[in-house]
């Protein structure tokens, strides 16, 4: 039971994962009372992974994906709730997804999800993977937090840590993509013979 738009995992706690009707009612009422609505979704038993995606300045239909990262939860925890992210994060560890086929599958679904939503600039996809290896997209975090200090790296930073170009290459690509997107939006309509043209914004 979540905030309807995720919102930095606000009010998401271990108790948000409910297994009884009474628990569902309690959590849903709490979230709706505080935020006006609640998102209720099926809990997927399995691994939790994340994939950073960046817009491709040359071909927006083939965005860049970075090394998928899998979380290792401490005993008693099974998903990334607010305290895991902001309070007890030292107990949470992560590692690159080791299975090459799974890593490619995660990149593929993240790439396609970003394109399907007409993603711009960058975003980070959070995905659960069940025991059969089937990925379930939880959400995409558009313009997610990045460039945190190395001692408190965010999830996007963990993905970039395994890319040769790192944060610098990532930032340069985003700037190039922004300029390319701007150029694509300017469509010349006609010329007046004097070197001037009329343009419209897409």
Please describe what each predicted stretch is.
Residues 1-25:
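Conserved anion/nucleotide-ligand pocket segment
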Residues 2, 41, 171:
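Short beta-strand segments
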Residues 3-5, 72, 86, 141-144:
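Short, small-residue-rich loop/turn micro-motifs
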Residues 8, 48, 145:
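Conserved protein kinase catalytic core
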Residues 8-10, 91-93, 150:
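Short small-residue beta-strand/loop micro-motif enriched in glycine and branched aliphatics
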Residues 14-16, 55, 155, 167:
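Short, glycine/charged-enriched secondary-structure capping and boundary segments
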Residues 16-108, 129-136:
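Phosphate-binding site of ATP-dependent enzymes
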Residues 60, 99-202:
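ATP-dependent carboxylate activation and anion-phosphoryl transfer catalytic cores
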């Amino acid at each position: 039971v979540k905030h309807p738009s995720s919102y930095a995992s606000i009010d998401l706690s271990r108790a948000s994962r409910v297994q009884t009707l009474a628990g569902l009612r309690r959590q849903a009422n709490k979230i709706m009372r505080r935020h006006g609505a609640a998102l209720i979704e099926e809990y997927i038993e399995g691994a939790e992974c994340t994939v950073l995606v960046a817009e491709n300045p040359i071909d927006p239909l083939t965005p860049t994906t970075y090394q998928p990262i899998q979380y290792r939860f401490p005993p008693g925890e099974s998903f990334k709730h607010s305290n895991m992210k902001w309070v007890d994060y030292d107990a949470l560890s992560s590692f690159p997804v080791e299975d090459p086929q799974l890593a490619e599958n995660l990149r593929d679904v993240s790439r396609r999800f970003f394109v399907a939503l007409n993603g711009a600039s960058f975003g980070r996809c959070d995905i659960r993977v069940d025991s059969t290896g089937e990925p379930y997209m939880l959400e995409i975090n558009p313009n997610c937090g990045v460039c945190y200090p190395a001692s408190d790296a965010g999830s996007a930073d963990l993905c970039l840590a395994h890319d040769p170009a790192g944060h610098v290459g990532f930032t340069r690509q985003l700037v190039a993509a922004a300029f390319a997107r701007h150029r694509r939006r300017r469509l010349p309509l006609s010329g007046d013979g004097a070197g001037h043209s009329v343009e419209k914004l897409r």
